Amino acid sequence: MDTASHEMLNLLKTRRSVRAYKADPVPEELLDQVLEAGTYAPSAMGRQSPILIAVTSPKYREQISKLNAAVMGTDKDPYYGAPVIVLALADPAIGPWVEDASCALENMMLAAHAL
């Protein structure tokens, strides 16, 4: 197995869900790289329909957290205090929008792990 293949498989094997975050802001350069990874995700018929929005403002992050918690029927922060929330918006009229957004999010999770 070549080095790139080995590194990719290792990345997939070692990625974990995180539920404890530092309060430090994410450097813009890293955030841009993670968002860029989302744009390389596969999508139905190559439409690249998901729109990715990084919410870095503490004020808006808190508002979105409260709205999502209410939808989930809880008062706990569904983002576990992460300093950035990435929203993947997709038009339900355009193909399998949930799957397209999910692929973009997975690419971003792998990129964040790699960085």
What is each model feature region?
Residues 1-115:
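Acidic, surface-exposed loops and disordered segments
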